[in-house]
Amino acid sequence: MHIKVLEIDVSKTYPLRHALLRKGKALESCFFPNDTSEKTIHLGAFESEQLIGILSAYPKDCPDHNHLEGVQFRAIAVAPSHQRKGVASNLIQHAIKIVEEKLHPDFIWLNARIEANSLYQTNGFKSIGAPFEIESIGTHQRFLKPLNNDT
């Protein structure tokens, strides 16, 4: 399987966001604050010409580390037919490089669904704090990946 990761327009993320992360909810539930900010980065993983995975990165301080510059990863999703084949890790690794080059944050953080914890641990993220509930979505764990020695 040959995967190509490219920057994409936010509108291309909505079908996978809706189907995998907001199933049964209105399409508008997939529109996030700052989706269209010029500093927000949206990535797509493609096999041939088919979009099979997405990841969005937003310059945003982490509630636990608001004294440093952070970038939040959100809406990481992979088509069911391609899950557990390294697509999400590929997206995460590409996103880390692009974010470091373009935005120069001190760290990257995210709120992960509990069932995805091992994905983020495998990619160098450390859990912080206790698990918490996001209403109508489920139990999440916050993760952080330092990008410099001060974090």
Model-found features: residue ranges?
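Short amphipathic alpha-helix that is part of the acyltransferase structural core
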Residues: 1-32, 36-52
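Conserved beta-strand in the GNAT
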Residues: 44, 50-61, 72-77
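A conserved beta-turn-beta hairpin within the catalytic core of GNAT-like acetyltransferases
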Residues: 60-73, 83, 102-106, 137
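Residue-level recognition of the GNAT/N-acetyltransferase active site
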Residues: 74, 79-80, 111-113
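Conserved acetyl-CoA-binding loop-helix of GNAT-fold acetyltransferases
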Residues: 78, 84-97
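Conserved GNAT acetyl-CoA-binding A-motif
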Residues: 92, 99-112
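Conserved catalytic-core motifs of GNAT/GCN5-like acyltransferases
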Residues: 109-111, 121, 126-142
